[in-house]
């Protein structure tokens, strides 16, 4: 199984958290050549450039790390399905991976613990359902442990599903059909002139 890092929103105030998290994941890939490590930014372009520039500043040649993939075009749902560990911050990916019973690591250090930004960290009241990395060292250790014990959160699955349903959508039933039905009803009441 893989482990995947989803780089979600470009957080204006979480620069050190972002930098440290990416470097620690790259470091994990370097030290664990037998593990496939995937970083999936939400967007390409400057987001990919950011990761390459970050590595370059640390004298790391990303192209030489054969087990590391950085690609924004990969299918998120396939990545979650095929990963044992998922790292995300302020993203629905946290809950999407949680209901698949994955080890979900939320980096929660640097600016995420500063008084001015602490209140903007999503799902904080549900942190007990996830692995919370409180430092770069803790992040590395949690990735390592997650790869060794990918099913450790089974006891939280029902609670994770409840949180998913609260913030995303009910799991039961065909959500696509429900959305189409809602849109059809809405369309009949709206006219374009």
Predicted segments with their positions:
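Acidic donor-binding loop of glycosyltransferase active sites
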Residues: 81-91
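Short acidic alpha-helix that forms the nucleotide-activated donor recognition element
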Residues: 73-83
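C-terminal amphipathic helix plus adjacent low-complexity
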Residues: 3-9, 35, 43, 131, ...
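Catalytic binding pocket for nucleotide-activated donors in carbohydrate/polymer assembly enzymes
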Residues: 55-60, 92-168
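Nucleotide-activated donor-binding/catalytic signature segment of Leloir-type glycosyltransferases, i.e.
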Residues: 52-72
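A short acidic (Asp/Glu
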Residues: 48-53, 83, 98-101
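Conserved catalytic-core segment of nucleotide-activated headgroup transferases in glycan assembly
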Residues: 1-57
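Short beta-strand/turn micro-motifs composed of small residues
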Residues: 39-41, 88, 106-108
């Amino acid at each position: 199984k893989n482990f995947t890092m989803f780089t979600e929103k470009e957080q204006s105030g979480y620069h050190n958290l972002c930098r440290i998290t990416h470097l620690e994941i790259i470091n994990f890939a370097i030290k664990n050549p037998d593990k496939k490590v995937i970083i999936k930014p939400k967007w390409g372009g400057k987001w990919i450039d950011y990761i390459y520039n970050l590595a370059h500043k640390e004298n790391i040649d990303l192209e030489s790390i054969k087990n590391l993939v950085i690609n924004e075009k990969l299918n998120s749902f396939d990545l979650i399905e095929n990963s044992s560990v998922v790292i995300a911050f302020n993203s629905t990916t946290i809950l999407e991976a949680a209901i698949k019973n994955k080890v979900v690591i939320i980096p929660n250090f640097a600016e995420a613990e500063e008084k001015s930004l602490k209140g903007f960290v999503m799902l904080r009241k549900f942190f007990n359902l996830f692995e919370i990395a409180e430092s770069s060292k803790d992040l590395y250790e949690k990735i390592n442990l997650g790869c060794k014990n990918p099913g450790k959160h089974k006891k939280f699955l029902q609670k994770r599903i409840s949180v998913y349903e609260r913030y995303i959508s009910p799991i039961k039933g065909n959500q696509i059909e429900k959305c189409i039905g809602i849109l059809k009803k809405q369309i009949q009441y709206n006219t374009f002139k």
